[in-house]
C-alpha cells in the first residue's frame, strides 16, 4: 500500500513538473527572441467545438497544444469577474439582458450556447475558474478586460497565475500608467496598436520611451507601405509581434479563411510569419498548429 501511495505521489510530482516546464517554455518564447518558435493564440478558446469562452473550449485548447487562449471579461451585479465577450448574454446564453444586471448565481443557473445557438450543458465560467484550469498548462490573454485590470490582477494573485497571463489595452502608455500604474509593472502588458489609424506611431513611441513590452498586438486593414513601415518600426524596438489572422480587416487580408478556404496558407500565416510575428491569434488553432509543425515552428 505504501509503495502504491509513493508511486501516486511521484506521478503527481512528475505531472506538476511537466506543467511548470510547459509554462516556462511558453514564457521564454513570449519574453525572449526565438524566431524558430511561433506561439499559437486561440481566439475565445475552441469555439468551433465548444461554447466560446467556456471551460470545455479552453480544455480543448490545452489538449491540442495551444500556447495561449484569449478570453474576455465582464463583471456581474454582485461583483464577480466572469468570462464573456458581449455586454449582453443574448447571443451566447439562454437568457437576455446585460451581464451586469445578473448575479453570478443567476448566470450559473443558465447555460451557454454553442456556435449554432443551441443550448449546451456548459455554464459561464468565472475568471478564477478559468485561471485554475489553465494553471501550469496554458497562457491566458485577457482581451476585453482592461476596465477590470486591478480586479483581474487580484484574481491572478489569488490563483498564483500572475506569471501566465497577458493583459492588453489600445491606449497610450501615459494613460495606462495613470489609470493602472499600481499593477502595470506586475503583469505582462501588451499594447494594441491599430496601424492604419491616425495616432498609431505616437502610441508606439509612447511605449518605446517608457518601457519595452513583451509584445505589441498589431491591427491593420491593409498591407500598404505605410503599414509595413510601422510593423518594421515595432519590430526594431526588440519587442515581439502579435498579429491576428481572425478576419481580413485585422491583418491586411492575410486571414485564416484565406489559408483554409482559399488554400493559401503561405499568403496568410506564412506572410504573417515573414513580417516577424511571434504570436498568431487564430480561429483555426488545430490547422495553424498543423501548419507550424510541418515547418518545425511548433512542437
PLM-predicted stretches and their roles:
Residues 19-299:
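Phosphate-group recognition and catalysis centered on beta-loop-alpha active-site segments
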Amino acid at each position: 500500500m505504501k509503495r502504491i501511495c509513493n508511486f501516486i505521489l511521484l506521478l503527481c510530482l512528475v505531472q506538476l513538473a511537466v506543467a511548470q516546464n510547459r509554462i516556462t517554455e511558453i514564457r521564454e518564447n513570449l519574453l525572449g527572441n526565438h524566431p524558430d518558435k511561433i506561439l499559437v493564440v486561440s481566439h475565445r478558446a475552441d469555439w468551433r467545438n465548444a461554447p466560446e469562452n467556456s471551460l470545455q473550449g479552453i480544455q480543448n485548447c490545452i489538449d491540442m497544444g495551444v500556447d495561449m487562449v484569449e478570453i474576455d471579461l465582464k463583471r456581474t451585479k454582485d461583483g464577480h469577474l466572469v468570462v464573456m465577450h458581449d455586454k449582453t448574454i443574448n447571443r451566447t446564453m439562454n437568457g437576455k439582458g446585460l451581464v451586469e444586471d445578473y448575479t453570478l448565481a443567476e448566470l450559473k443557473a443558465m447555460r451557454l450556447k454553442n456556435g449554432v445557438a443551441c443550448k449546451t450543458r456548459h455554464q459561464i465560467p468565472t475568471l478564477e475558474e478559468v485561471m485554475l484550469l489553465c494553471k501550469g498548462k496554458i497562457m491566458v490573454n485577457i482581451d476585453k478586460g482592461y476596465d477590470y485590470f486591478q480586479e483581474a490582477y487580484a484574481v491572478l494573485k489569488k490563483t498564483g497565475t500572475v506569471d501566465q497571463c497577458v493583459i492588453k489595452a489600445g491606449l497610450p502608455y501615459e494613460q495606462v500608467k495613470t489609470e493602472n500604474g499600481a499593477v502595470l509593472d506586475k503583469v505582462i502588458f501588451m499594447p494594441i496598436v491599430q496601424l492604419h489609424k491616425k495616432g498609431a506611431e505616437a502610441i508606439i513611441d509612447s511605449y518605446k520611451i517608457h518601457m519595452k513590452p513583451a509584445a505589441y498586438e498589431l491591427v491593420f486593414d491593409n498591407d500598404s507601405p505605410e503599414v509595413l513601415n510601422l510593423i518594421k518600426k515595432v519590430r526594431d524596438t526588440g519587442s515581439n509581434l502579435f498579429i491576428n489572422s481572425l478576419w481580413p480587416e485585422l491583418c491586411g487580408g492575410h486571414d485564416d479563411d484565406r489559408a483554409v478556404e482559399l488554400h493559401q496558407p503561405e499568403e496568410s500565416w506564412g506572410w504573417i510569419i515573414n513580417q516577424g510575428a511571434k504570436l498568431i491569434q487564430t480561429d483555426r488553432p488545430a490547422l495553424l498548429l498543423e501548419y507550424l509543425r510541418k515547418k518545425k515552428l511548433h512542437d
